[in-house]
């Protein structure tokens, strides 16, 4: 490993080993039956599984599986219906390289960027690290539409959710101000609409996941994001050219396990 500031930067082989050991890639925690269910729901265009994207044409479950084999590395056997599923760590590494290269471009151009997450439990610290690197490189980190509120369906009744920021990172919070998991593209749509209404320039790049990335990509904004093996919409979005980069990885392991990933990305992007 090499040093970058106070971080230890793994080389490619070391990071690959870490991805497999931590189950960020390789044999991941998400079971096959959950993946197949999500593939089917996305193919049926269930809004909760589209992440704000509007795919072209018809996507049958077998078509979604084929994309997920190629772009994520899930088990290709269509008769494998339950149990262990996988993410190819080499596809993760390739995705991280493309992700870092797009961040490097943003830094060179000093772009206007929104950094956001629908997975605050696992990924908020990672995104804070990326946002700090972009800020230090001269990018403008946008924080629009704070306190914009909407209702989300819930089994026990609609729940209020609002846009808030943890440092420069956008999140959705509940009525107590606690960050919450979300697939919704409504927050990024509200942000983009608010910027347009005030005549402010739209972001050059959105860095995120779930509906933050999908909704931005659907709106024509360059969008890069992490996506789990049960998040087929972002990979379909990448297949169709709406999502610039979809990195296959488990998006909800313990936060400290993403530190080597952040160090690698920042180093490759020249932001460390």
Predicted regions mapped to residue ranges:
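Long, charge-dense
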Residues: 128-187
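C-terminal functional extensions of proteins
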Residues: 201, 216-272
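Generic beta-sheet signal
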Residues: 144, 209, 224-228
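Electropositive, gly/pro-rich neighborhoods at or near active sites that engage anionic ligands
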Residues: 2-112, 117, 122-129
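Catalytic alpha/beta core domains of metabolic enzymes, predominantly
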Residues: 177-193, 213-214, 224-226
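A short acidic (Asp/Glu
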Residues: 123-129, 154, 214-219, 234-237
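Internal active-site segments that recognize and position negatively charged phosphoryl groups
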Residues: 188-217
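Short phosphate-binding/catalytic loops that engage adenosine nucleotides
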Residues: 111, 139-140, 221
């Amino acid at each position: 490993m090499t040093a970058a500031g106070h971080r230890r930067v793994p080389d490619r082989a070391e990071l690959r080993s870490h991805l497999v050991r931590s189950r960020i890639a390789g044999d991941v925690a998400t079971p096959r039956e959950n993946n197949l269910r999500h593939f089917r729901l996305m193919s049926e265009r269930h809004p909760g599984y589209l992440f704000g994207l509007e795919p072209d044409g018809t996507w049958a479950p077998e078509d979604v599986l084929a994309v997920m084999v190629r772009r994520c590395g899930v088990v290709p056997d269509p008769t494998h219906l339950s149990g262990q599923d996988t993410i190819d760590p080499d596809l993760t590494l390739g995705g991280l390289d493309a992700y870092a290269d797009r961040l490097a471009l943003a830094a060179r151009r000093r772009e206007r960027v929104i950094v956001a997450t629908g997975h605050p439990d696992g990924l908020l610290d990672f995104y804070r690290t990326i946002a700090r690197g972009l800020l230090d490189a001269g990018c403008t980190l946008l924080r629009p539409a704070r306190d914009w509120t909407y209702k989300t369906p819930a089994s026990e009744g609609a729940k209020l959710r609002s846009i808030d920021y943890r440092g420069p990172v956008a999140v959705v919070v509940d009525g107590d101000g606690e960050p919450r998991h979300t697939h919704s593209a409504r927050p990024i749509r509200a942000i983009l609409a608010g910027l347009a209404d005030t005549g402010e320039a739209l972001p050059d790049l959105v860095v995120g996941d779930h509906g933050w990335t999908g909704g931005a990509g659907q709106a024509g904004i360059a969008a890069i994001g992490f996506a789990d093996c049960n998040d087929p919409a972002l990979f379909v979005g990448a297949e169709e050219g709406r999502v610039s980069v979809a990195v296959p990885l488990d998006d909800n392991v313990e936060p400290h396990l993403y530190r080597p990933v952040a160090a690698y990305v920042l180093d490759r992007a020249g932001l460390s």
